[in-house]
Each structure stands twice: as structure tokens, then as C-alpha cells.
Amino acid sequence: MKILNYWSKGKNMTIKLREDQMMLVERVLKNIREDNLVVSPSGSGKSYILAYLEKLLTEQGYLVYVYAPTIEVREQLDELMKENGSSNKTKGVIEDINGDNDAPDYLLIDEAHHSEAETYQMLFEKYPNAVKIGFSATPERLDGKGLDNSYQNIIIGKTVRELIDNHILSDYKYYAPSVSSGIQYSIKKKYLEVNGETFFKAVRKESGYQKKIYADVLKTWIEKGENKQTILFAPSIAMSKAFAKEFSQNGIVAEHIDGLMKKTERKATLGAFRRGEIKVICNVDLISEGFDMSDADCVILTRPTESLAMFMQQAFRAMRYREGKTAIILDHANNIGLHGEIDQVFEWRLEGKESRGDNQGYERTVWGRFNSNAVFDKNVELQEVVKNYNGLYDKKIEEAIKLGNIDGLKILLEIEKEARIVSVGKYSWAYSFALHNGFDIPVQ
């Protein structure tokens, strides 16, 4: 395999990468003979890195196939590669499995946390000699499966907070139900079993996390949404249509969109939203994974999910940077109560971990048929998530860590209840102490 002269080739590209993006490219190229997973937050420009590498490899004479999970994301990547002077087109995994294509040298895979799915594994078996380069913001699966079966190296980019501080992502205000007991904590494996329960399950049980839709969605948006361009994520198509109708009946231009609509109709609706003709666009997850919607400044989350990937993908739809912008996230599902804050520092790894959910099919079954008001709790209001990095609770946190049991866990929850939603600062004494004593803070 030839050595890539990426410095000379890269200068001729239309796409110009930032320094942090170029560092990720360099790290991929240093391991270009191995399968690499590139991890960087939503909105950090992974698609640009993918398009950059695609042309770089293609110009060196390699056959490169590019894959993305949805038609909308494929179209975005096609446009980006075209803009960069490439004639390559993205492929659908299933159609490629059934097709008769030449064996590629490289597979570039967007939203690569899907790599353990059966269809992707069939693709990898079809092209056993191809080198894989995957891209993901959240390399964690709900079923707990790792990605080490598909990738050899994990290459991690900047944190969310670093990207915010460098004006790559927008800063934000986050509103969550007042019932939330806040950020959860986990313990490394040797501390997991306590009275027959894992700490993760104990935290979830003690925190009061339930699959509900809290507060009045319309009223909250009017009070806290600041009349911003908004994407609403609903638990089902029926619910999405119902929310769009409710907003429209109250004088707010809102539309529903889903994958069953004609392509021309979807494009027209998205175009109207981008032009500002539609204020609120409602969907289930069409405008979620990998979708670039830089016009959105507010996100409404009404879909409870145990999937960290889904939570992060949806929350970040409002985080694209624009000067003077502050994104607003209205978390009616209290997903922050289960997953933690969106700018927490993750310790990503290729290996698997314990499944996040006891009932992984819950959303597909219950929420898919959802048509009842029984899961609404409009007696609760959303409150702004307040961060506290001043070490006020360090001694109590130290005590809880030393206990290392359910009693200690309850102390943590009591602390968080007092402070509403409080996270421990990355550089605080408590953070360092917790890591040293085997705690992962925040939980992934």
C-alpha cells in the first residue's frame, strides 16, 4: 500500500479543515493499514473529514466506497464530496450487499456505531480485505456490544466543551424537569455488584427516571423557546403529527415530517424550514442521526430513550455554531436524568459494556403504539440546568465515594436534589478524587 502524500494533495482540495480536524486526519493516516474509528461530537465536522479522506485516497488510486444510514445523510455527503471535486457517490449497505461490485480498498462508514448490525457485518464479510474507517459521535450501542470486532483503533477528537469554547459549537441553555435528580454516577466493574444489583440500575431506580413526557410542551416552548427555529422529536409519528397540529392551532407555523412522505414533499418541508417559513418542524428521528440542520436554534425532546446515541444526536441538532447564538434544549423526556449532561467528558472505548436497558424493545413496542395521555405529567415544569463547579459539595461527594455502596449512592442523589441538577467540574478536586477511587464521572 502506497504512502499517502496528504500534505501536497490536501492543499488542492476545496474543503479546508480546521487544525483539530487535520490532526484527526493525520492520526488516521498514521494507521492507514488498520481499521480506525474516528470519534468526534455531533456538529464537529466529521462529514468534512470523511469527504477529505475520500478524495485523498481516491486520488492515490484506491477504490473507496462510502456508506451512510439514511437517504438524507447520503444526499448531504454526496453534495459535500461533489463540492470537494469528487465524483464518488455514497452507497446503501443493503443494496451493496446484494450488488455485484468490485472489491474496494477502503470502506468509509458514517454513523459507524451501526457497524455491529447484521447488515454491516455482512458487508464487511463481502469485502474482507477492505480497510474500514468509521465515523461516530457516540460509539456506544444500547445492546452493550462493543465495536472492537470491526475496528482496531479508536481516534478521539476534541470534547464538546472544547468545541464550544473555540466557537465550533454553540453554547446552550438546557431545561429539564424539576423532578430530575440530575447527573448519574457509575462505578468501575470491581464495584458493580451491590446487594445483587448493579450501581447503574440502582442509580436509575433511585433517581426516579421514568419514561414520561413532563410539562406542557407548547406552553414551555412559548415561555422558554424564545421563538427560535425549532426541531421537535416525538415518540411516534402519530405524536409528531399531534404536536404539529397543536402548535399550528395556536398560531405557530409547524409541520410534521417523516420517512414515509414523498421525497419531494420532504425536501419542500425542509426547505421551508431552512428559509424560516416554518417555525417548528416535528419528527420522530428523521432529522436526527448525522443530519445537518444548521438553521435550528432550539430542540424539543419528547422521546424518552435509553439510547445515549439517540439522545446526543437529537440534542445536538440545535448546536451548530452561529455568532451570538445560544442554543436551547427543552428536555421534556428527562433524558438528562438518565444520560447526564451533553457536554460531559466521555471515556470512549471500542470494548463493549453493560446494556443500558433492561427492556431494549420498549420504544419499538410501547411507544410505537402510543396514543394515550397516561404518560404525560403536566404538573411538572422544566427548569434550567444549573452547573456548579465551585466544589460546594466536595466533602459529601468524598464521603459517598468512600462508602462505595447504595447508602453512598443515596447521598449523591440527596446532594443533587438539593442543588437541582449539579455536575462536578472536570478540573475540580472531587472529579480527580473520584477517578482515583474508581468512579467514572460523568457516566457514559
PLM feature segments, named:
Residues A117-Y174:
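Post-DEXD/H (motif II) to motif III coupling segment of the RecA-like Helicase ATP-binding lobe
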Residues I154-I231:
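Conserved interdomain linker/interface between the two RecA-like ATPase lobes of SF2 helicase motors
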Residues R33-Y52:
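Walker A/P-loop
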Residues Y67, I71-A103:
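Inter-Walker segment of RecA-like/P-loop motor cores
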Residues K279-N283, E289-P304, M310, R317, ...:
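A short beta-strand element within the Helicase C-terminal
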Residues I3-L37:
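Conserved pre-motif I regulatory segment
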Residues R317-F346:
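Conserved segment of the helicase C-terminal RecA-like domain
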